[in-house]
Structure formats: C-alpha cells, structure tokens
A protein has these predicted regions:
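Conserved SAM-binding loop and adjacent beta-strand
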Residues: 10-29
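Glycine-rich helix-loop-beta junction characteristic of Rossmann-like nucleotide cofactor-binding loops
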Residues: 29-36, 56-57, 98, 136
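Conserved class I S-adenosyl-L-methionine
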Residues: 35-46
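Glycine-centered, small-residue-biased loops immediately flanking beta-strands
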Residues: 38, 62, 142
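C-terminal substrate-binding/active-site "lid" region of AdoMet-derived donor-dependent transferases
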Residues: 41, 76, 116-120, 124-162
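Conserved SAM-binding loop of SAM-dependent methyltransferases across substrates and taxa
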Residues: 47-60
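Conserved SAM-binding motif I beta-strand of class I
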Residues: 63-68
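S-adenosyl-L-methionine
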Residues: 70-113
Length: 162
C-alpha cells in the first residue's frame, strides 16, 4: 500500500483510473443516475474513472462517450472523443454520433492556481459549460451530474439549472 488515502488505494486495487469513481458510484446508488442501456456522455473524462463506472452501470447495451482535451487511454466499451466540449464542433460531433443522451456527467476541474476564489470561479464556469452542453445533448427526462467547487457562483448556477 501507499501512503495515499483509502479511496486512492482502493481505486488502484479495483482497477479504476481515479478515486473519484467512488463518488460517482455513490451518487448513482442514491440518485439512480444510470440505467441499463443508457447513453452517457462524460465531459472532461480524463483519465476515465467516471467513464469506467458509467460503462459498468449501463451494461453492454449502453453507450458511453468520453470527451476530453487530453488523450484518454482506451477503456473497453467506451468511445473516446478528443476535443474541447466548449467548442461547437465538438458538441456537433457528439450529437452526430449519439443523437441524444440519457445522462451527461462532468468531473471537470480547472487548472488550479491555489487562489480559492479564482479556482472556484473557474470551476463554476466549467460547470456552466457542462450545463449548456447538457441542454443540447439530453433527451426528455435526462440527467446531469456535475462536480463544482463550492463558491459564490454555485447558487446562481443552481438556480439556472432548476
């Protein structure tokens, strides 16, 4: 074992690429985010931990598209798309591939500066971009799960989402 935390060690033992996989599993268990056969788009997917969980949960009949600026190592049953989800071209490529999604997830984080308010504002911007992308991709009754750093921009974003 390493000196890392429990979830880091567990992720490595169980083959997940990131400890955040457990956050998504817990969310799915409490909110019923995924269903068998769902189509899922994972925005800001690298290194792929959330895509791995989505793949497990939707099964072989489901579709998972992982989108990121960075290259994502292949994941069985997951289609990767390298691109910037804030670009219209990337969103159009996703829509051409799947039509509509049942679930959009985003674990995007900004490049950290160490300045809390700036990092929180950048996180909120990425969350808003994920929300706007989800509006284009989600079918009726679709779900969005997005990670965001707590800050002054969370409340206005939450209001817009509701």
């Amino acid at each position: 074992m390493t000196g890392k935390d429990e979830y880091y060690n567990r992720a490595k033992q169980e083959g997940y690429r990131a400890r955040s996989a457990y956050k998504l599993k817990q969310l799915d268990e409490t909110a019923g985010l995924f269903g068998p056969g769902n189509t899922v788009v994972d925005l800001g997917a690298a290194p792929g931990g959330w895509s791995q969980v989505a793949r497990e949960r939707v099964g072989e009949q489901g579709t998972v598209i992982a989108v990121d600026l960075q290259r994502i190592k292949d994941i069985d049953g997951v289609e990767t798309l390298r691109g910037d989800m804030t670009d219209d071209d990337t969103r159009e490529r996703i829509i051409e591939r799947i039509g509509e999604a049942d679930v959009v997830v985003s674990d995007m984080a900004p490049n950290m500066t160490g300045e809390y308010h700036l990092d929180a504002a950048r996180s909120a911007h990425l969350a808003r971009m994920a929300f706007e992308t989800a509006l284009e991709l989600l079918g009726a009754g679709g779900d969005l799960a997005v990670k965001i750093f707590e800050g002054q921009d969370v409340a206005p974003l939450r209001e817009d989402m509701e």
